[in-house]
Amino acid sequence: MRKIKSLALLAVAALVIGCSSGSKDVEQASVNELYTKGTTSLQEGSYSEAIRYLKATTERFPGSVYQEQAMLDLIYANYKTQDYTQVLLMVDSFLHQFTQSPNQAYAVYMAGLTNAATGDNFIQDFFGIDRATRETTSMRTAFSNFQNLVRVFPNSPYSQDALARMAYIKDALARHELEIAKFYAKRKAWVAVANRVVGMLKQYPDTKATYEGLFLMQEAYEKMGLTALANDTQKIIDANKDKTFAPIEKPNEPDLKVPAVK
């Protein structure tokens, strides 16, 4: 029993010593040492280790020449570890600290990717049991991020990919709205059905889901005895019956590279 206790104490002591030395490694290192270790870890794919050193670089030496690059590296490293909350915090901090940086486009792009990844479960689980109340805030925020990127930085290397992701998100959100309209139709909530499809026509007019929603809207108007509106809806359906909708695939994960501060 004494031997077991001794071994346990040795293990605890080793752990304490290890933590202490690791802490000193960060607390006492120079800004050059911290940044070098951080970037080396990043290149090796040791993202958690990279975050430890780069975070110390930005927090212990906030005015250093490495600040901008270290923050960009941290955005990337946190994204790779799927710490999405930290990514968004770092993006917000970067945008406020470096208002004139040409790398703002990268930061906004990463915010879009992060919000899209946060909402990815919504996309994957879309056609589950009952998704009528599924939260879509992250996907809508991602769309807004990409939209701002394309508007403010139209010539950035991220704009084309942002456009593709906007198309995918818009299609997914339209399908989500259609599912809600179907949900209401099953419960014969015809006013809610009509209102939902009207909203789809305003927000997602050029999607397949919205065209399919027109049939629900026509049915809703008929059930409510609104013959004129039902006939108008039929005219819209007929006018678009030959329209084709190309399938929109989910964009692949981008080949991300952290931009170099010049």
Swiss-Prot record:
Keywords: Cell outer membrane, Lipoprotein, Membrane, Palmitate, Signal
Top-rank taxon: Bacteria
InterPro entries (alphabetical): BamD, BamD-like, TPR-like_helical_dom_sf
Localisation: Cell outer membrane
Lipid attachment locations (S-diacylglycerol cysteine): 19
Pfam families: YfiO (PF13525)
A Gene Ontology biological process term: Gram-negative-bacterium-type cell outer membrane assembly
Predominant cellular place of this UniProt entry's protein: membrane
SUPFAM superfamilies linked: TPR-like
UniProt GO cellular component terms: Bam protein complex
Span of the signal peptide: 1-18
Function recorded in the entry: Part of the outer membrane protein assembly complex, which is involved in assembly and insertion of beta-barrel proteins into the outer membrane.
Assembly mode: Part of the Bam complex.
UniProt similarity note: Belongs to the BamD family.
UniProt-listed HAMAP family: OM_assembly_BamD
Protein name: Outer membrane protein assembly factor BamD
GN (gene name): bamD
